[in-house]
């Protein structure tokens, strides 16, 4: 009798554990909650406000997910870990100001581009840095795994500067202010946010940068059904003006 009861209890525990696991790792078509990976150091796209992660990308993700029949849970991690987390199914999608470069497209799929920005050289106002030529012999910071890191490597041989990487944009800004970096390459809309709270910083847009080099898109696993669903929702938001309203809200302060 005791043996029978023990077997019954063991069976119940096994069933319960299996049920819990499947509720978190079910197929994309069967679950209603999606985990969004992001690097919450990229204001106004994604950043921490108290205990919450907010920003343009976060609000966009929630709006798109709602149209597609899902809810979004946001998970913060270093930018260079995002694609690995997506491929290993730790997250279901990535919104983090990520550019769909050819190298990234080999690993994951992307939505249509939802925002295009420019690269900016950020430095102290008293640095004497006013153009790319002024970077000769300087140390320029870039975010690890970012499109700005690629841009830095592309420009450094021509303009004679060296690059160093950091995990977070806030780290780059701190290194400039501490004189460990002479400058950094940061997306313009993000840099503008730092200028507002750091009046000792300045910046200029890198000239002749191709627009598609700085376009942002949503990353999904290869052959994910979510890609088409989110593209459809994104097209709807573009057509009805919702996307433009979000851009004005987060980038210009317009309601």
From Swiss-Prot:
One example of a Gene Ontology biological process annotation: amino acid transport
SMART domains linked: PBPb, PBPe
Membrane topology category: Lipid-anchor
Lipidation (S-diacylglycerol cysteine): 20
Signal peptide: 1-19
Deletion phenotype: Cells show impaired growth on arginine as the nitrogen source.
Lipidation (N-palmitoyl cysteine): 20
UniProt KW Protease keyword: no
InterPro entries cross-referenced by the UniProt entry: Iontro_rcpt_C, SBP_3_CS, Solute-binding_3/MltF_N
Gene Ontology CC terms: outer membrane-bounded periplasmic space; plasma membrane
GO MF entries: amino acid binding; ligand-gated monoatomic ion channel activity
SUPFAM superfamilies: Periplasmic binding protein-like II
Family designation: Belongs to the bacterial solute-binding protein 3 family.
Task performed by this protein: Part of a binding-protein-dependent transport system for arginine.
Protein name: Arginine-binding extracellular protein ArtP
Upper lineage: Bacteria, Bacillati, Bacillota, Bacilli, Bacillales
């Amino acid at each position: 009798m005791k043996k029978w009861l023990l077997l019954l209890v063991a069976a119940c525990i096994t069933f319960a554990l299996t049920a819990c696991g499947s509720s978190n790792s079910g197929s994309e078509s069967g679950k209603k909650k999606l985990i969004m990976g992001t690097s919450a150091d990229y204001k106004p796209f994604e950043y921490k406000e108290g205990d919450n992660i907010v920003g343009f990308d976060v609000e966009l993700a929630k709006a798109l997910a709602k149209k597609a029949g899902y809810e979004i849970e946001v998970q913060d991690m270093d930018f260079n870990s995002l694609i690995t987390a997506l491929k290993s199914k730790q997250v279901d999608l990535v919104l983090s100001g990520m550019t769909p470069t050819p190298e990234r497209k080999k690993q994951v799929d992307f939505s249509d581009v939802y925002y295009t920005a420019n690269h900016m050289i950020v430095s102290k106002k008293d640095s004497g840095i006013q153009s790319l030529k002024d970077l000769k012999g300087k140390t320029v910071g870039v975010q690890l795994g970012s499109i700005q890191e690629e841009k830095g490597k592309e420009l450094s041989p021509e303009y004679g500067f060296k690059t160093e990487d950091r995990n977070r944009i806030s780290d780059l800004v701190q290194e400039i202010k501490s004189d460990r970096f002479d400058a950094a390459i940061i997306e313009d809309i993000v840099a503008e946010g730092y200028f507002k709270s750091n009046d000792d910083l300045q910046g200029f847009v890198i000239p002749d940068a191709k627009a598609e080099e700085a376009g942002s898109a949503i990353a999904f696993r290869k052959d994910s059904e979510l890609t088409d669903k989110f593209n459809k929702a994104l097209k709807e938001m573009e057509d009805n003006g919702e996307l433009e309203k979000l851009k004005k809200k987060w980038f210009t302060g317009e309601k």
